């Protein structure tokens, strides 16, 4: 019998984060993976709008359980570099996949992307599933 593998899902409480969550849970359910929901605040800022509280974390774990997926929330402090945090969490969990959400951008925005998503796509040594929320 093979051991379970892990998917790391980057989660923020936005439509982009929800798209990543849904895609990641689908993938985990299909392949029998565990999930780590990475919700990493900047330098432990508890006023960060992307930082989820304990009740929301519990709700996300329950949503995963409802579809048969074991999940936990990781709120590792990422300081100034979220890519490094993803790298560390992916390595620590031996992740087979990372799922991130992407914002829709204008044509000009696509040309001048200096985004964390682009850096993740270029720098992370784990397969990445990047999804957009529905229009």
In which residue ranges do the predicted regions lie?
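Short secondary-structure boundary segments
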Residues: 39, 97, 101-103, 132-133
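Glycine-rich, Arg-bearing micro-motifs that act as flexible, cationic patches
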Residues: 100-123
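Conserved acidic residues
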Residues: 5, 96, 125
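Structural beta-alpha unit
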Residues: 1-2, 66-98, 104, 118
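Short, flexible loop segments at boundaries between secondary-structure elements
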Residues: 126-135
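A structural preference for short, hydrophobic beta-strand core positions in alpha/beta folds
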Residues: 37, 73-75, 130
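Small/aliphatic-rich secondary-structure junction motif
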Residues: 2-54, 67-69
């Amino acid at each position: 019998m093979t051991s379970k593998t892990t998917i790391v899902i980057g989660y923020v409480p936005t439509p982009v984060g929800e798209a990543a969550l849904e895609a990641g849970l689908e993938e985990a359910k299909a392949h029998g993976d565990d999930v780590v929901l990475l919700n990493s605040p900047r330098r432990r800022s508890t006023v960060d709008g992307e930082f989820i509280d304990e009740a929301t974390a519990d709700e996300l774990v329950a949503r995963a359980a409802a579809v048969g997926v074991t999940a936990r929330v990781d709120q590792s402090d990422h300081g100034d570099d979220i890519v490094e945090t993803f790298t560390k969490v992916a390595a620590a969990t031996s992740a087979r996949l990372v799922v991130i959400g992407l914002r829709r951008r204008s044509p000009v925005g696509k040309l001048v992307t200096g985004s964390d998503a682009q850096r993740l796509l270029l720098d992370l040594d784990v397969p990445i599933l990047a999804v957009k929320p529905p229009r």
